[in-house]
């Protein structure tokens, strides 16, 4: 259905002056270092590592797609190629694995005005965090908005952009945490 001549083929979707890469890289054949951050000491150590650079990628993992009606289930960060940190959130409570406790520990990081926050659809992440009383300060760079500027008609999912511009096929979020909603 997605070839010229077939019903449902959208020629505009294929039309682009931007180069396309073949997504031949994936988690199986690309070196990576992913770390799960659990506990107060690990969070303090993580903050020191992540603030070594002033450009930090952030993503929130939530229970749904409506930022006004979701619970936080985790936060992911990166400041170096092929390196990532994941902070799981068990519930919305004040306990050591609860969102309020974890976000309070991360508050100095979020309030650092020297950091540039990078992400895909940052408005969503910022709104989710705002519901928990967290305001990210500093500059922002949204890959979804940047892609819109260079290719207004293109598709913008993070997986598609990763394949198109990095040649990397990411593990889908559904495979990691299950279907949202």
Predicted regions and their residues:
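A short acidic-Thr-Gly-centered motif at the start of a beta-strand
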Residues: 39-54, 107-111
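Short acidic, Gly/Ser-rich segments with clustered Asp/Glu that frequently serve as metal-coordination loops
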Residues: 51, 55-68
């Amino acid at each position: 259905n997605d070839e010229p001549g077939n019903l449902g083929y959208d020629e505009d979707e294929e039309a682009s002056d931007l180069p396309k890469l073949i997504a031949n890289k994936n988690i199986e054949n690309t070196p990576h270092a992913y770390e799960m951050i659990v506990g107060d000491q690990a969070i303090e150590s993580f903050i020191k590592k992540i603030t070594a650079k002033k450009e930090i990628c952030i993503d929130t993992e939530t229970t749904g797609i409506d930022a006004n009606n979701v619970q936080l289930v985790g936060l992911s960060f990166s400041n170096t190629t092929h390196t990532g940190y994941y902070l799981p959130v068990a519930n919305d409570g004040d306990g050591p694995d609860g969102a309020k406790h974890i976000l309070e520990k991360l508050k100095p990081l979020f309030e650092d005005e020297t950091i540039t926050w990078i992400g895909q659809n940052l408005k969503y992440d910022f709104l989710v965090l705002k519901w928990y009383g967290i305001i990210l300060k500093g500059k922002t760079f949204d890959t979804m908005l940047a892609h819109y500027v260079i290719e207004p008609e293109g598709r913008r999912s993070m997986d598609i952009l990763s394949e198109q511009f990095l040649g990397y096929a990411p593990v889908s979020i559904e495979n990691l945490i299950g279907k949202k909603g």
